[in-house]
Swiss-Prot record:
GO terms for biological process: L-arginine biosynthetic process. Catalyzes the NADPH-dependent reduction of N-acetyl-5-glutamyl phosphate to yield N-acetyl-L-glutamate 5-semialdehyde. The gene is argC. This is N-acetyl-gamma-glutamyl-phosphate reductase. It comes from Alteromonas mediterranea (strain DSM 17117 / CIP 110805 / LMG 28347 / Deep ecotype). Keywords: Amino-acid biosynthesis, Arginine biosynthesis, Cytoplasm, NADP, Oxidoreductase. It holds the Pfam family Semialdhyde_dhC_1. The keyword Zinc does not apply. The keyword Protein transport does not apply.
Amino acid sequence: MYSVSIIGASGYTGAQLVQLVLQHPKLELAGTYVSENSNDANKSIAELHGNLAHVNATLTPISDTALSEMANGVDFIFLATPHEASHDWMPILSSGKAKVLDLSGAFRIKDTAVFEQFYGFPHTQTQSLAQAVYGLAEWHEAQIASADVIAVPGCYPTASLSALKPLAHNGLLDESVRPVINAVSGVSGAGRKASLTTSFFEVSLQAYGVLGHRHTPEIEAYLGTPVIFTPHLGNFKRGILATVTVKVKAGTTSAQLEKAYTDAYADKPIVRLRKSFPKIDDVAHTPFVDLHWKLDEASGYAVVTAAIDNVMKGAASQAIQCLNIMTKQPIETGLVL
């Protein structure tokens, strides 16, 4: 058994991690933590998340001393914390035997100037940044297997890259035309903190972060080409539906697209290649990525749709996939019945 601590267990992603760790046959939950100034410090996790009413776990406030002890006291640490906290704590947490899986955006972007532009604070943890491996589980398995620090991808990048990487990997994209990604996320993507934008009476379908969302440089860095990315807030709880329009190279056929996706995901049990365009209900509360595509050979434009649960594959279950890779278990262990 591998011991696991979760920092930031009060939020949606942290609570989902608690549930996944508890149901995993090879993991034991060593502790659940929040920051010292959290309003949820010393509360029961059952008090915050009714689906965990059966779980006897307290949200312990974490100190710098406790961080250092944790680094040598458990096998794995999940960070479901704000970007700034992950940035500041990583050198301590990664200094011991524990392997760290960070679900914030603090270590996804290697270019520190780009990071500061999109995240609003300077990145000074250069050693940890160099150490971090991007945890897109289906595409970076070899690097993940030997990593000590994992930067778990963002929710929108997970959906977008899952849709686009088979085309890029096979050289099928017309690089003179940027892929256009329109993606809609449920309000859980904004976290538990109350805000007018995500309140019941105010939430509606709306674009946000237009031509400036912080997931744009993340997608571009791991796709290898610029994109036009427009996220939308939807009036539902969970899930992301990303619809991607791309121009493929002249002469590309539907058979080539079929082969690209089949070859990429034939042995990837978390990715489901669908016969029709997926919907969010197909993936809500599951770890799956559902994909479908259609090509107009006359114009050279293809539309690819990816559906994921933003809290699962977009965060917590992908972190578990990475842990499974790191411990040489089947990637779907603890995730798929």
